[in-house]
Each structure stands twice: as structure tokens, then as C-alpha cells.
């Protein structure tokens, strides 16, 4: 269970059982184990190495090309290192596969991870490599003098992001990318319904406008767009939605020690409210309906909450839109922070 202050928003590269590290991968049921890894005095360029890297790419061909080009450039600098890339479309699948492979000692050398996943990996014996000594090594660490590329120094890494890669006083990952959530809005639809997009969205406003947008005419078509499809409000991550709502209500979700607090009266009230809007057709989620951007861009959605990392998919002029140009509708896009209770 993720503590809500993590909010699944930051990603990092974790070094899981690096090449040359001892790899006794039996589960320890709650104990925090460290891999027996020591920084070598020098890098042996005569020895061949293979590194397995598990990454996420959202089925984005441009992102895939960046991964491949980066690996190609890296292998040109280090011809004795081969990087084997495996791409996933879901962070949870990487997490599950790492856990599954701990028992068979087939974890990747490097993987993209949420910081809170590392705590689970550490329950295995000698699975995750602590990076403190490697990061500080003057030759091969951050900004190291013997590196074949221009590496950032530790001082050049945003300290707040680096801190999220620390657990029990040790660094187990390096920051890789960062995003948050935003609400992408069809401003034309909001105004067509007689409303004005406020600077700060509230849940009451979202629900009221969404219910208005869900109304159908006598011909059983949606009044707002004259079509057969309209999902006024779509939230990409229901995990994040619940975390946001409970945090805003100062209600329990979980503690840093893993204590579950989500089963409370506030959660019950929130879920009943959401269920009402699902029944009326005013609300849906990615897992039920698909990507919010596809509906927003086609004029079939008013409010779409998604990651800022996906901004290039949102709106009629989105360069990475997954729908055809013929299906896109022209409208003014407004962007706001996620809805608030106050």
C-alpha cells in the first residue's frame, strides 16, 4: 500500500542486483537486506558485460527510439557492454515481474521504478544495490573523472528528487523523470453549458458540470455534442484519485510503516458519491473506458485528468494524439490542477 505522500508521481532508476554483485535472492519476509556490492578499483575494459534494463514507454514510438539511441550511444562509448532493453507499458507490470523473478534469481540489472516499490524489493536478500559509495566514487560516481560521458554531479541533481530515492539512510535509485497530474478541459463545452472555468477546480464544480454534460435529448443523443458518445469526466489513475481525495479530506490512506487506514467513513462517502456519478454516465476511468485523451480530443469528454507527462497527447493540436485527424474536434483547451474540496 502506497503512503499518499508518494502519490505515484516520481520515477527512478533502481539498480537491482548489478552485474558482479552477490545474488542470493531468497525472500526474507520483511527484513531489509542489502546486496554485497563493492565499487571496483578500476573498470575492466577487456571483460564483456551484459546489462538487462527494464523500462516503460507507453507504446510511444518516439520514446522507444530515444531509449534505443541512448543505448546505442552508450555502447559506442563502452563497446564491452551490451544493454538488453525490455519495454513495458505499465509500471505495475515491471514491479510484479521484479518480485516474481526474485525467487528465480532472474531480476534485471537496472529497472525503472517508483520509489515506494524499492521497499518491497528490499525484503529479498541481496536484491537491490545500495548506491552511496558508487555515487560518491571520484572516478566512476556522479561526475566521475573516468567516465566516458559528461555525468552530472550529485550537487546538480535536484535534492528533493534524490531524497525520494533514499530508504533507511541509503540511496537505492537515481531520479529519472518526474510528473504530476493536471486536469485538461474542453473550455468550449464548459462555456456552452453556461459555466466559466475557475482558476481552482472544485469537486462540486466538476460533478455539477459533468452531470449537465451527461444529459441526452429526445433523440437519445447527447445534447452537448450531438453524438452517441460522451463521458464528461475521466480520471486516468483511480489510485491517484482516491489518494488525492483522502488527502484533501485529511482522511487515512496508509502510513509510512504500511499500516492500512483506507477503510473509513470518509472513503465510504467518497465511493458512494463516485458511484452515483458513474450510474448517471457523468464519470468513468481509464480502466473502464480507455485513455482520457482519446475522448477529449474527439469532443467526447469535458474534463480529463492525466499525467503532465502525457500533455503532448492532450488537445486537438496534440502532436502524439492516438486518434486520427478526422476524429479530432477543434476546441480551446484549459489546464488546471486537479479538483479540490476547498
Predicted regions, residues:
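Paired acidic/hydrophobic, glycine-rich loop segments that form the ligand-binding mouth/hinge
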Residues: 109-112, 302-306
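Short, solvent-exposed loop/beta-turn-alpha elements that line the ligand-binding surface or hinge
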Residues: 132-156, 199, 224, 249-269, ...
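Conserved N-terminal structural module of periplasmic/extracytoplasmic solute-binding proteins
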Residues: 4-10, 21-127, 144-147, 151
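Hinge/lid segment of periplasmic solute-binding proteins
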Residues: 38-39, 43, 116-180, 327-339
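Glycine-centered hinge/linker elements that transmit conformational signals in sensory
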Residues: 209-211, 256-287, 338
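Short helix-initiation/N-cap motifs at beta->coil->alpha
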Residues: 87-97, 203-207, 285-297
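Extracytoplasmic/periplasmic solute-binding protein
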Residues: 163-176, 181, 205-260, 303
Amino acid at each position: 500500500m502506497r503512503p499518499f505522500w508518494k502519490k505515484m508521481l516520481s520515477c527512478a532508476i533502481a539498480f537491482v542486483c548489478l552485474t558482479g554483485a552477490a545474488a542470493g535472492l531468497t525472500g526474507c519476509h520483511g527484513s531489509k537486506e542489502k546486496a554485497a556490492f563493492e565499487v571496483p578499483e578500476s573498470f575492466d575494459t577487456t571483460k564483456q558485460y551484459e546489462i538487462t534494463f527494464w523500462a516503460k514507454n507507453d507504446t510511444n514510438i518516439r520514446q522507444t527510439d530515444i531509449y534505443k539511441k541512448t543505448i546505442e550511444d552508450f555502447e559506442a562509448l563502452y563497446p564491452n557492454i551490451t544493454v538488453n532493453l525490455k519495454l513495458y507499458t505499465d509500471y505495475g507490470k515491471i514491479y510484479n515481474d521484479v518480485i516474481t523473478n526474485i525467487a528465480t534469481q532472474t531480476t534485471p540489472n537496472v529497472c525503472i521504478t517508483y520509489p515506494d516499490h524499492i521497499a518491497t524489493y528490499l525484503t529479498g536478500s541481496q536484491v537491490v544495490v545500495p548506491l552511496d559509495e558508487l555515487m560518491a566514487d571520484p572516478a566512476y560516481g556522479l561526475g566521475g573523472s573516468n567516465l566516458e560521458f559528461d555525468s552530472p554531479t550529485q550537487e546538480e541533481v535536484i535534492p528533493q528528487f534524490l531524497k525520494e530515492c533514499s530508504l533507511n539512510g541509503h540511496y537505492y535509485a537515481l531520479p529519472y523523470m518526474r510528473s504530476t497530474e493536471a486536469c485538461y478541459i474542453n473550455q468550449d463545452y464548459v462555456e456552452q453549458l453556461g459555466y466559466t472555468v475557475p482558476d481552482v477546480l472544485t469537486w462540486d464544480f466538476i460533478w455539477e458540470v459533468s452531470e449537465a454534460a451527461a444529459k441526452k435529448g429526445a433523440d437519445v443523443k447527447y445534447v452537448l455534442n450531438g453524438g452517441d458518445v460522451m463521458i464528461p469526466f475521466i480520471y486516468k489513475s483511480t489510485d491517484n484519485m482516491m489518494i488525492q481525495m483522502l488527502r484533501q479530506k485529511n482522511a487515512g490512506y496508509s502510513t509510512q510503516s504500511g499500516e492500512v487506514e483506507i477503510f473509513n467513513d470518509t472513503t465510504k462517502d467518497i465511493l458512494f458519491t463516485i458511484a452515483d456519478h458513474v450510474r448517471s454516465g457523468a464519470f468513468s476511468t481509464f480502466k473502464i473506458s480507455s485513455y482520457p485523451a482519446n475522448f477529449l480530443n474527439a469532443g467526447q469528454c469535458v474534463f480529463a485528468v492525466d499525467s503532465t507527462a502525457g500533455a503532448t497527447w492532450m488537445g486537438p493540436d496534440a502532436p502524439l494524439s492516438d486518434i486520427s485527424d478526422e476524429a479530432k474536434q477543434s476546441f480551446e483547451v484549459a489546464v488546471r490542477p486537479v479538483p479540490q474540496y476547498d
